[in-house]
Structures are given as C-alpha cells and as structure tokens.
C-alpha cells in the first residue's frame, strides 16, 4: 500500500541527509506499546533525525474532509501550555528543528537534533510534549482554518490543482484515497477544534505509529529513545486496514474546460503492491518515462 512505500521513502531521504554512501543495515523492532521502529546507525555527523509516522492521513478523514491536514498543521502550535512562539524559540536555542506534514496515507512529526546530550535530551523532552500534549488553541485553529480556506479558493484558479483533484477522484472513486488532503470549503468551514482533538486522540497513538531513527546513536540509545517517545503516547489501537484499490475496468477520458493559456494532462492507473515481484521493474520503467 501507499503508506509502506512512503515510510521507506522517508527513511531513504533521511539516510541521504546524513550522507550515507554504502547500503545501510536497517534494524527493526516493536516497542512495548506497539510502535514499530526502523533504525539506521549513521556516524558521519553528530546529529540524529527522528520521524514518527502515523496512519493519520487524509484517507482517515471520513466525512470531515480536511481534518487530518488541519490536525497535523496544529501540532507545534501549542502544547503542554506552551505557545507556538515558545516552542519554536526553545527548539531554536538548542539548534534543533521541528517538522510536520500530512498526505493522503500518512501524517508525521519530525525532529532533527545534535546528539550532544545537553542538547538532545531537552529537545526530546519538548518533542515528546509536542507529540503527546497538543493543546489545539482556538486562536491558532481559527488562523489555520482561515489559511486553508484561502488556499482552497486559490486552488480553484490553478489548472494544475483543478486537474489533480479531478484525477484522484476519477482514479479512486469512492476509495478513501480520493479525499483531497485540504478538504473542501464546505467541510473545512464546518470543522471545530473539538473535531481535531478527537482525530488526534484516535490516530496519534503508539500502535498507529512507526518511529524512524537515523543518526549518530547506537541501537541501545535508539531503543531507549523510541521507547520514551512511544511511552509518551497513549497505546491506542492501530487504524483499520483500508480496502484495496479497485483496478480500472477500462480506460476513460475526463476533460475540464478552464480559461488558461496552457493545457495540463494527467495520466495514470492504480499501481501494484510494493511486495509484487515486478515492483522494481515497474518503478525503474516509470522513471525512464520521466
């Protein structure tokens, strides 16, 4: 499925960021709370990249399109009584970087820090609060909601955005992957901070998480680090498996008229699972096409 491929892609990107040249050994285990861990020891630079990936993307929106994206956007905007400014300043003082993002099939929260214990430990403690004690302040929720609504109106003027939305809807039909991560103006307007808190409590849990660690730490250190982050989260339950994507019975063409000087053409079909024996042949072939 998409999520497995995305998690492995994230791991690959993190490896490149730490200048790994040889094929690394990927260690994997599960914490007592049920979080899956992927770890690569990379000693080239005195830093560590940590990313917690949750099955909490737009495919989990249901009839509240946009809730996954807004929930993720509010992480780091207020946690454990700290404001967004206080959180950002604290990470900056330690030379650490907080990141987050959300797509159709996953959402994540990340930390990059130097491995000096005087910097790493307090960064991890703050990261744990952002991860597990998000406040979703009303003022920040209203700001992000308005920003999303402005973005949705802007997308209505962009041929690329119009085409992309139509493409996913045509390709996936009633499947959850058809849901646009940004939602619609109607659904986003109807969302409340309470909706975000409920989504957060359901999906940002240990059993629904994959912890990716790459950097200048030993496996023992990584085990302690992963356990501390997983322990900060409620155990929860893993999100149910999404239904398989149906294959197209036949090709079809969709045309959308739009006043523009250029035409945008999107073409595609549901792919194959990563475990398929032909996956890498198709992957390379797709890159050859550009």
PLM features: residue spans?
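Bacterial N-terminal signal peptides that target proteins for export
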Residues: 1-8
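N-terminal signal peptide c-region/cleavage motif recognized by signal peptidases
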Residues: 17-19
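N- or domain-start disorder-to-order transition segments that initiate the globular core
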Residues: 21-47
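Histidine-acidic residue clusters that define the catalytic metal-binding segment
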Residues: 23-30, 87, 169-209, 240-246
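M16 family metallopeptidases and their MPP-like homologs
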Residues: 40, 45-71, 84-130, 145, ...
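Acidic/histidine-enriched alpha-helical segments
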Residues: 84, 88-89, 135-153, 218, ...
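Non-catalytic, conformational "gating/processing" segments within enzyme and secreted inhibitor domains
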Residues: 160, 165, 193-229
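An aromatic/glycine/proline-enriched structural segment found at the starts
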Residues: 173, 177-181, 210-273
């Amino acid at each position: 499925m998409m999520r497995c491929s995305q998690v492995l892609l994230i791991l690959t990107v993190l490896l490149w960021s730490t200048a790994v040249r040889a094929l690394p050994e990927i260690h994997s285990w599960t914490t007592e709370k049920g979080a899956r861990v992927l770890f690569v020891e990379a000693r080239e630079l005195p830093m560590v990249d940590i990313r917690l990936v949750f099955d909490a993307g737009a495919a989990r929106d249901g009839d509240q399109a946009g809730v996954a994206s807004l929930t993720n956007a509010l992480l780091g905007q207020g946690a454990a009584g700290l404001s967004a400014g206080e959180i950002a300043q604290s990470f900056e003082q330690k030379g650490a970087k907080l990141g987050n993002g959300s797509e159709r099939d996953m959402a994540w929260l990340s930390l990059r820090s130097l491995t000096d214990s005087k910097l790493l430990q307090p960064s991890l403690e703050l990261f744990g609060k952002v991860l597990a004690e998000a406040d979703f302040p009303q003022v920040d929720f209203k700001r992000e909601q308005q920003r999303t609504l402005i973005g949705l109106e802007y997308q209505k003027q962009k041929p690329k955005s119009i085409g992309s939305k139509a493409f996913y809807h045509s390709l996936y039909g009633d499947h959850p992957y058809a849901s646009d991560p940004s939602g619609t103006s109607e659904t986003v307007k109807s969302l409340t901070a309470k909706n975000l808190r409920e989504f957060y409590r359901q999906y940002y849990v240990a059993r629904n998480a994959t912890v990716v660690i790459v950097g200048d730490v030993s496996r023992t250190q990584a085990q302690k680090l992963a356990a501390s982050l997983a322990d900060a989260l409620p155990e929860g339950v893993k999100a149910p498996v999404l239904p398989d994507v149906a294959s197209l019975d036949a090709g079809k063409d969709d045309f959308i008229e739009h006043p523009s000087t250029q035409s945008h053409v999107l073409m595609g079909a549901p792919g194959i699972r990563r475990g398929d024996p032909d996956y890498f042949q198709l992957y390379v072939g797709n890159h050859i096409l550009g």
